[in-house]
Amino acid sequence: PEMSRGLGDVYKRQELLREAKRLGFSDFQIARFVLKPEGTNMEKENLAVRARRKELGILPAVKRINTVASEHPELTNYLYMTYAVQGYDVNYYKNEKSVVVLGSGAYRIGSSVEFDWCGVQALQTIRKEGYRSVMINYNPETVSTDYDMCDRLYFDELTFERVMDILE
């Protein structure tokens, strides 16, 4: 209730914007709800919310997916981004060259396995050429999301906001 009443104050109240992000609202949804840009360029409004969020230091944390029920220290490359906690589970190597591959997402008739195979081939070529490979995909059914296919695997949505958060 307070969230819906107060989103108009998003540019004034850092804690409200942080809470909106923690609850899962995208920058696009916040822009549409707060700025109500009927007939305007939503890309511009979306970028305005993104810029304000970054200016306020509201950034997602990168966490590892726990695949072993905390039985021993987690060292997988399965990652996701969240606003629910702070702190990173991984270190970033800014001096190492990385190439990001966008995954196939959900399987669709006529464009599923073939598109995933393209991603796998891209990841193998990236590694062969000596670059760090990063895959962003939310479909665990694909070969490209196997743990040994890439150096970093983000199980996350394929949206402008999420891809940019990972790239930055």
Please provide the spans of the model-predicted regions:
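Intrinsically disordered or highly flexible coil/loop and linker segments, enriched in small
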Residues: 26-29, 132
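ATP-binding N-terminal substructure of ATP-dependent carboxylate-amine bond-forming enzymes
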Residues: 39-44, 51-55, 60-168
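Short alpha-helical "recognition helix" segments of helix-turn-helix
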Residues: 19, 30-31
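Short, amphipathic alpha-helical "recognition" segments used to contact nucleic acids or chromatin
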Residues: 12-25
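Short flexible coil/turn linkers enriched for glycine and charged/polar residues
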Residues: 23-26, 93-95
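Single conserved hydrophobic/aromatic residue that forms the stacking wall/gate
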Residues: 1-11
